[in-house]
Amino acid sequence: MAPKARLVAYKTNWNVQCPTFKTIGSNEIDVMAAFEAAIDDGVDVINYSQASNNSAYLDDGTGIATFHAMKNGILTIAGAGNSGPNAGTAANNYPWVLSVGASTIDRVFSAHGTRFYDFVSKVDVPSELYPLITGADARISGANVSDASLCQGGSIDVTKVTGKILVCRNAGRIVAKDETLASVVARDAGAVGMIFVYEEKIGDGFTLSQFHAVNTIVLSYKDGETLFSYINSTRTPTASISGVTNTLGVKPSPIMGSFSSRGPNQNNPGILKPDVTAPGVDILAACPPEIFQSSYCMKTGTSMATPHVAGIAALIKKVHPDWSTAAIKSAIMTTASPLDNDGMPIRDSNKTSDATPFAYGSGHVKPNMAMDPGLVYDMNQYDYLNFICAYPPESTTLKEFSQQHSYKCPRSFNILDFNYPSISIVNFTGNAIVTRKLKNVGPPGTYVPRIEPPPGVSIMVEPKTLVFSQKDQIIVFKLILTADINHLSTDYIFGSLVWSDAKHVVRSPIIVKAKNK
């Protein structure tokens, strides 16, 4: 994303034992030390491809470290986590951090019309037909049938698998090590290849790519059922694994990754998280060759999406070196799109229903548009401190964030006036006023609003137009929301606000949840 950027790496996780994938995680003190080193080194952007605990802002070392980075003009881009699609799983929910979900790209690898996603190893792909055998049929005497179906270690009979293609099932969860370790079992059993089939509850038509120790085809549940029907229809099932072809411009895309963590924000549902989504499925990434037997492999996760956005932030910082972290974040969020390349709403991982802002935040990132957003929602550290004061914290704890002994919480602070690029209203009682400030970072222009209100909610905006006569001019506007609360859904409902001058599009999602009756 930022081809001439200088990269500096800081180690935070000292407890990963590769290649067994037994991960304990990072200690907060190591995370904080890495951030302080980055701050001292004068980096411009921090990529944090690691999920934090959903603890209170003031009780979390990552929250404190990222706040200190923001104070020093460094924006942190962090992964929303891979605990989706369940609601309320989004991590790194700090308002001064740009959190990122993961979605697909418009590229697939296919072979003879069968779509699959695969790490292409250095060895030649065998083109002839080989016998197929399922993990269950390859079970070693005394092993559990379920374990053998999943191709778990110690469950497969080498004498039954050597020279064949082993068919393994997924455990019904999206965990990279399941797929990888199954391929290791296949390799150690002498298989010439593996077919890995995902379970239905992950999302039909959805597959991932991970590191494979043998040549591998990964199938969705639907395609897997077709394969198993074929296997059961003949006494001698055979298959071949052919080389891949690269297809671009696939529609529809993006589609949300089912693993991508979702909102609402468990720390504070008044702040929408994740903030945006970016390419995070089947990404060609650099890998340590001593572990993955190659310098490159296909990877999936919000840890892959996060660097894409960090690169965008670095490019914005290069073009606009005087912008605050909030301005850079706003530019990325307000230019993101909730539509796919068919012009339709981004679909969820099941491919049949529309995703919501709890999956994609403000939308899928648009790098070129983010360089010239027109307007930004700007903030500084005191805006974030005022936000924290709304809870309220103990003053001694607050000093860990501010290090400003003269700072005192305001007498009152309305979170609806927090100048965030997205708008969330919880415990809505039928009337609410939201205040925002927009700063002109482009040429003079007149912006007019376009509102798509959440169902059952009426929204008025004041003033009706925003006329900017010069750069850096700031204009305050208000949204006035009204609804018949007795007839309003108590579920989360969604809308949007767009300010446009015919060239720039400054979009904010609107999320409303009525107070429980």
Question: Where are these predicted regions, by residue range?
Answer:
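Loop-rich non-cytosolic ectodomains and luminal regions
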Residues: 1-517
